[in-house]
């Protein structure tokens, strides 16, 4: 029988821990602060940013949303980031994707102070993750949230075969690094992988992050595998679905995340957790 991983329930636990940490910092006169910069009026981004802001405020954090027009130049955006880098009340900076064509996204990522890189995308922090560098640094929130879910459900990656389908810098690559650091044997699969579904069937832990609705069906899943569906897609009827065909996976997967209600809540909860950690770490380093 397939057990459903309740991302909302795990996120609730993380948020409770974060609220406690915020209160502890408040007793020291520190309020964790996050600045989210959004360029343009992408509808999905607006909803996501609104959810982030609401959650941060609810947890007692200082939250700033900087809305910029789609015509914003790269230099203007860089100047705003520089100001937040220098602002001691801001501990985490996030520039929401997608960005307009006139803005070089890698350059923007590089401009954020690595100590305020709440998304964990700065090459300095990515390098630390890849090398399993000791110490405190931010890690991409969706993969980190997935690792938290696995731990909460008693899934230890050590010695297991893990397959990550998708090689983005947001999910796929950092996910593979975290699983490797946790002693799993990891394969990264993608659109150019020969016989992708045969590779998927080898996985004890299968993470699917492609943006292709129902790419993976029950026939592609190893019996008893843990399946993490990162997809947020729309089917032909406009219904929100994942990269995994949830219905056909029933009775085959041992554990599976639903869409919605699986990975999504964990991403925002982990973002808040990371912001508070950045505030703690900055206080120690000052």
Curated annotation (Swiss-Prot):
Where is it found, in Gene Ontology cellular component terms? cytosol
Among PROSITE patterns, the record links this protein to: THF_DHG_CYH_2 (PS00767)
Which catalytic reaction applies to this protein? (6R)-5,10-methylene-5,6,7,8-tetrahydrofolate + NADP(+) = (6R)-5,10-methenyltetrahydrofolate + NADPH; (6R)-5,10-methenyltetrahydrofolate + H2O = (6R)-10-formyltetrahydrofolate + H(+)
Supply the EC number(s). 1.5.1.5, 3.5.4.9
What GO molecular function terms would the record report?
methenyltetrahydrofolate cyclohydrolase activity; methylenetetrahydrofolate dehydrogenase (NADP+) activity
Looking up SUPFAM superfamilies in the UniProt record yields:
Aminoacid dehydrogenase-like, N-terminal domain (SSF53223), NAD(P)-binding Rossmann-fold domains (SSF51735)
UniProt: NADP(+) binding residues: 166-168, 191
Pfam families to which the protein is assigned, alphabetical: THF_DHG_CYH, THF_DHG_CYH_C
Q: Which CDD domains match?
A: NAD_bind_m-THF_DH_Cyclohyd
Is Translocase tagged as a keyword? no
Pathway note? One-carbon metabolism; tetrahydrofolate interconversion
Q: Which GO terms describe its biological process?
A: L-histidine biosynthetic process; methionine biosynthetic process; purine nucleotide biosynthetic process; tetrahydrofolate interconversion
Q: Which UniProt keywords apply?
A: Amino-acid biosynthesis, Histidine biosynthesis, Hydrolase, Methionine biosynthesis, Multifunctional enzyme, NADP, One-carbon metabolism, Oxidoreductase, Purine biosynthesis
The record describes the protein's role as:
Catalyzes the oxidation of 5,10-methylenetetrahydrofolate to 5,10-methenyltetrahydrofolate and then the hydrolysis of 5,10-methenyltetrahydrofolate to 10-formyltetrahydrofolate.
Cross-referenced HAMAP family, in alphabetical order? THF_DHG_CYH
Record's subunit section = Homodimer.
Query: Matching PANTHER family, A to Z?
Result: C-1-TETRAHYDROFOLATE SYNTHASE, CYTOPLASMIC, C-1-TETRAHYDROFOLATE SYNTHASE, CYTOPLASMIC-RELATED
Family membership, please give it.
Answer: Belongs to the tetrahydrofolate dehydrogenase/cyclohydrolase family.
The identity of this protein, by name, is Bifunctional protein FolD
Q: Which gene encodes it?
A: folD
């Amino acid at each position: 029988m397939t057990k459903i991983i309740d991302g909302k329930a795990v996120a609730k636990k993380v948020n409770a821990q974060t609220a406690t940490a915020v209160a502890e910092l408040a007793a020291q006169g520190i309020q964790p602060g996050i600045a989210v910069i959004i360029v343009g009026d992408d509808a999905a981004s607006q909803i996501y940013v609104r959810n982030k802001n609401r959650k941060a405020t609810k947890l007692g954090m200082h939250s700033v949303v900087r809305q910029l027009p789609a015509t914003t130049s790269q230099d203007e955006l860089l100047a705003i980031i520089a100001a937040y880098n220098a602002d001691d009340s801001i501990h985490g900076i996030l520039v929401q994707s997608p960005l307009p064509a006139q803005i070089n996204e890698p350059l923007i990522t590089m401009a954020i102070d690595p100590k305020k890189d709440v998304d964990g995308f700065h090459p300095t922090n990515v390098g630390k993750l890849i090398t399993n560098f000791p110490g405190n640094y931010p890690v991409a929130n969706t993969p980190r949230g997935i690792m938290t879910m696995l731990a909460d459900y008693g899934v230890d990656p050590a010695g297991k075969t893990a397959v990550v389908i998708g090689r983005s810098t947001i999910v796929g690559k950092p996910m593979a690094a975290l699983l490797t650091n946790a002693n799993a044997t990891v394969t990264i699969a993608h659109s150019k992988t020969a016989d992708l579904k045969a590779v998927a069937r080898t996985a004890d832990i299968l993470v699917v992050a492609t943006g292709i609705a129902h790419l993976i069906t029950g026939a592609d899943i190893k019996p008893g595998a843990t399946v993490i569906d990162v997809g947020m897609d729309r089917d032909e009827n406009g219904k929100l679905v994942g990269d995994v065909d949830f219905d056909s996976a029933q009775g085959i997967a041992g554990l599976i995340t639903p869409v919605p209600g699986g990975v999504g809540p964990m991403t925002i909860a982990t973002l808040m957790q990371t912001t508070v950690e950045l505030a703690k770490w900055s206080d120690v380093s000052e």
